[in-house]
Amino acid sequence: MAAARSRVVHLLRLLQRAACQCPSHSHTYSQAPGLSPSGKTTDYAFEMAVSTIRYGAGVTKEVGMDLQSMGAKNVCLMTDKNLSQLPPVQTVMDSLVKNGINFKVYDHVRVEPTDTSFMEAIEFAKKGAFDAFLAVGGGSTIDTCKAANLYSSSPDSDFLDYVNAPIGKGKPVTVPLKPLIAVPTTSGTGSETTGVAIFDYEHLKVKTGIASRAIKPTLGLIDPLHTLHMPERVVANSGFDVLCHALESYTALPYHMRSPCPSSPITRPAYQGSNPISDIWAVHALRIVAKYLKRAIRNPDDLEARSNMHLASAFAGIGFGNAGVHLCHGMSYPISGLVKTYKAKDYNVDHPLVPHGLSVVLTSPAVFTFTSQMFPERHLEVAEILGADTRTARRPDAGPVLADTLRKFLFDLDVDDGLAAIGYSKADIPELVKGTLPQERVTKLAPRPQSEEDLSALFEASMKLY
């Protein structure tokens, strides 16, 4: 009891500190809105939108009761071919049958979905006339289910209507959606907590997505028992996604420095910039990653480590789902989208694949060296959490210290030696930069603006890590 009380006090102190200081922890700023919304060029407020989440070993068995309570009569269960034969999906179906819930299974979800795979799932959802959705799988499955729910609830909309600008029209979601329950089986995306759905837009060979609080799951069931089936490299790459979600959201441009100021609350973006509440979740997720990720990768039977990483994924999701991510993710989308022949170990797919978490983390040393010029104290703080000795470090040391800490972390976990190791060369940099430019939804949240030349230099620096 005393330990729990101490933990609460510690978190409250973190919140108090974050609310009183700017992201560099050295200059105070006012929380007052100042001018009216119509008169400001930058935002003055932030929102926290989070799915209801339930955590516990075996909690998946409750899903049938949840859908019964929601009044669901016809449920769309989405998963992928591999997972459809594994215990998580069987546990879900047993619960649905036990509670008299009618359902149809869609198991054609693509790992790293595309606009084509999204539209196939959407068509299935439209024909099924479902009154609730249930996603069992990793981020690809949950994101596909979000899209199916959205477009089947808005059947006359064009696919690009809700896709993020500049690739799509980025229209706000105003139609009511059906309940969606997410049962994550990996520990990385945090998609069970966020209003974001990511996919490859095949025409341009880039990743983009849909971002709206309206599409976040109604309920996320976080069951650590599902993590025990994950292969080593899936655990690793999922964990790298958690790592970068937390690092990027904590070092993102502060919400009150983001522009433009929205003319209405409905136009305030899902990704709003770092803020005092997201900061707490990001820091806590980083501490869990530092303590448990290596254990979770190396020992598949370590339920404590894998359970904590499952929680860290949700914690980081709460943080970045409202604060946002920036350059690591913005640059990762063309890295995944332009993949040539690389096939990651432990992924049972029939197409070339750079897992999302790997594509994100390979640029992290270069990115945080670049961004450390803004808010260096934050960069030193996260380096210390990850194991660096920062007692004699100065502000100008922040970038190199964090970059070296990340390189050591990745080397210890047998991560590929940079972009060159997954099939890229300097000749590919112009296309990688071209694929990053449309990702302004996230790249504009970097604390430091970047030119095309800057992006080229970051990709070049990421060709080799060690």
Curated annotation (Swiss-Prot):
One Gene Ontology BP term is: glutamate catabolic process via 2-hydroxyglutarate
Query: What GO cellular-component annotations does this UniProt entry give?
Result: mitochondrion
**N6-acetyllysine PTM sites in chain numbering:** 444
**Pfam families tied to this protein:** ADH_Fe_C, Fe-ADH
Question: Listed disulfide bonds for this chain?
Answer: none
Q: Which residues carry this modification: Phosphoserine?
A: 451
Question: Which is an annotated GO molecular function term of this record?
Answer: alcohol dehydrogenase (NAD+) activity
Q: Which reaction does it catalyse?
A: (S)-3-hydroxybutanoate + 2-oxoglutarate = (R)-2-hydroxyglutarate + acetoacetate; 4-hydroxybutanoate + 2-oxoglutarate = (R)-2-hydroxyglutarate + succinate semialdehyde
Principal EC category: oxidoreductase
Principal place of residence? mitochondrion
The record ties this protein, via InterPro entries, to: ADH_Fe/GldA, ADH_Fe_C, Alcohol_dehydrogenase_Fe, HOT
Which keywords are on file for this protein?
Answer: Acetylation, Lipid metabolism, Mitochondrion, Oxidoreductase, Phosphoprotein, Transit peptide
Which Gene3D superfamilies does the UniProt entry name for this protein? Answer: 3.40.50.1970, Dehydroquinate synthase-like - alpha domain (1.20.1090.10)
> Where is this protein localized, as stated in its record?
Mitochondrion
Write the Enzyme Commission number(s) for this entry: 1.1.99.24
Known role: Catalyzes the cofactor-independent reversible oxidation of gamma-hydroxybutyrate (GHB) to succinic semialdehyde (SSA) coupled to reduction of 2-ketoglutarate (2-KG) to D-2-hydroxyglutarate (D-2-HG). L-3-hydroxybutyrate (L-3-OHB) is also a substrate for HOT when using 2-KG as hydrogen acceptor, resulting in the formation of D-2-HG.
Would you identify the family this protein belongs to, as annotated? Belongs to the iron-containing alcohol dehydrogenase family. Hydroxyacid-oxoacid transhydrogenase subfamily.
What protein does this entry describe?
Hydroxyacid-oxoacid transhydrogenase, mitochondrial
Species name: Bos taurus (Bovine)
Q: Which gene encodes it?
A: ADHFE1
